[in-house]
Amino acid sequence: DSTAIILEEGVQMIPIQTPKGEFKVFTKRIGDNPTMKVLLLHGGPGMTHEQYANFKDYFPQEGIEFIWYDQLGSAHSDQPEDSTLWTIERFVDEVEQVRMALGLNKDNFYLLGQSWGGMLGMEYALKHQDKLKGLIICNMMSSLDEYENYAKKVLGPQMPKEVFAEVMEIERKGDFENPRYMELLGEHHYPQHVLRRPPNEWPEEINRMMSQVNPNVYVFMQGYSEFGITPGASLKGWEIKNQLKNITIPTLVVGATHDTMDPKHMEWMSKQVTNGRFLLCPNGSHLSQYDDPEHFFPGVIQFIKDVDSGDFGK
């Protein structure tokens, strides 16, 4: 019942105009700070804000306001069945409409995105950085071809030889319905590179998010593969390496040693943007807020406060 949702404290269902009509997206504001408001862009595409559930254990005591948000197509927002909506440009426009509805501006608006959310954050900044106070790019490279290369040449071979061979064979055949695929990755890839805990110890909210991913969005844009972007998926070949220099606002790039994304590339990105800082999570992987919170949160919080106080870059 949507009326009940609207009554929950901090929740705002925001109407979004699209080429296919109006839809509503879920946001939930936690805290209140006139100069530090962080909008969180989840990954996937098609995952949920629960990727950031544990931010509530770190940001409020620092006085930082943050906003959980499910992008269009995700579990707590409307889920139109129209694949023409799943483009980077339309998602950028959606973020801009959310920004306006929440009253965020260059005096208070920080954008944090992880994985696909990082991609969306960079694309948003390239178009609308005059609205931003700071940008935080977590666990996302600036070239999907280079990500693919890293996954196949560096991460894959870390698996037992026969396991990687079997995974690659399933990929070659496009046999992604095969339960063996998830079985092998669940044992040999996710606990090493996505969230470094045994699968039976993954946080409930992350399991819930994984079970709620919208395949209509995820598969259309990124495909089934965990070793790159499936041919035919709409994000194939995406890259903005050469445009990073055009991002001039204060930018934090967060990498992790065990990530699916190459931390060396992430560090390089922090030097390509005009005004960057790099944060490494040495114990972390793709969801480093969960497997390396000891480095992730102090580093992110310090960046937000340094930008706010004017100390960033001094």
Residue ranges and their predicted role:
Residues F23-Q79:
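Conserved HGGG/HGGXW glycine-rich cap/lid loop of the alpha/beta-hydrolase fold
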